[in-house]
Amino acid sequence: MTDKSKESGSGKLLYCSFCGKSQHEVRKLIAGPSVYICDECVDLCNDIIREEIKDVLPKKESEALPTPKQIREHLDDYVIGQDYAKKVLAVAVYNHYKRLRNGDTTSEGVELGKSNILLIGPTGSGKTLLAETLARFLDVPFTMADATTLTEAGYVGEDVENIIQKLLQKCDYDVAKAERGIVYIDEIDKISRKAENPSITRDVSGEGVQQALLKLIEGTVASVPPQGGRKHPQQEFLQVDTSKILFICGGAFAGLDKVIEQRVATGTGIGFGAEVRSKNETKTVGELFTQVEPEDLVKYGLIPEFIGRLPVTTTLTELDEEALIQILCEPKNALTKQYAALFELEDAELEFREDALRAIAKKAMERKTGARGLRSILESVLLETMYELPSATDVSKVVIDESVINGESEPLLIYSNADNQAAGAE
């Protein structure tokens, strides 16, 4: 091989055989048998090969699958409470990926079935966060779908196969990657049958969607148009095997507690023989959810076939005040840590006092929005401060106490050039 400096002695102008640039337009021109390549094309080739190796080479199978204990420990870092749900999810997810790694059939010829998951719990209890955290930890594609937007094929709304299309989009239409993914279908309780008895009128967003989801969740080869767009006969479809995809369905199931209570209630007779129960015996929604049975879900409006496709059912409890305070402070990406990091970018420290955290938790409890309501409370409390802080000078610390949360006072600003004075005012 020679470079352009050796060839230029002949006086002949040389060009790169790939991009056509002359030897004067590039730093280096490398010669081969009757061909030349410039340094820019070499760099481009290196980039292409590097990208292809990164995308094509699978992860080493020797990499150990995280054990249920390790999965649970990781969930503990991001999700507060819900210990039973974490344990159930850890075991179900571990078994699912162990099945994928070792094939559907054991050495004895036993076929391993797929165990999709149903999460039942009040709003803001951590259903979505659990699914997202699992997918991130396992480094698999993840997508969310809203069951309320789904309709039967042929009606206005989203087709159930759009769920698989979203998953493919997340992994650049790599079918093999998508088949290892996790799909979380939220608001699954909203597609319950409108009446317990089947109606003669079509229920395109309720029972119809459940019927459409059956095969997708159980395992079928879904035909998905590449790069989105509507289906048409001349189009080639991507074939995705959904039997390898883990489906997690979640919903608040408002009113399910009444169905369970009706079933478990004893002494419902009338007259002198009736058993009188005191108010103290009344169970909370979370306690009733733990006693859920398939028959309760059928009565609620899910069809038996659909419930059968979700064999792993776990419930999440309502978050109490102490749990909400922990959520504000303890997880790796806790809200107080997020806002503190934002303030740090403005060279200011953000401090929440203990009474402030309790007041925030109390407000969220009153709103009955669970952990989801915490961010909106903090946003409204810190709005003025976040608006003024970038323009202010010498603010070294912002202190939030209970009176600020209750709207009785403004956040305390401590200035770096008047520390003693600010401390005295405090």
UniProtKB/Swiss-Prot annotation:
The keyword Ribosomal protein does not apply. Keywords: ATP-binding, Chaperone, Metal-binding, Nucleotide-binding, Zinc. One of its GO terms (biological process) is cell division. ATP binds at P122, T123, G124, S125, G126, K127, T128, L129. Component of the ClpX-ClpP complex. Forms a hexameric ring that, in the presence of ATP, binds to fourteen ClpP subunits assembled into a disk-like structure with a central cavity, resembling the structure of eukaryotic proteasomes. This is ATP-dependent Clp protease ATP-binding subunit ClpX. PANTHER family: ATP-DEPENDENT CLP PROTEASE ATP-BINDING SUBUNIT CLPX-LIKE, MITOCHONDRIAL, ATP-DEPENDENT CLP PROTEASE ATP-BINDING SUBUNIT CLPX-LIKE, MITOCHONDRIAL-RELATED. It comes from the Bacteria. Belongs to the ClpX chaperone family.
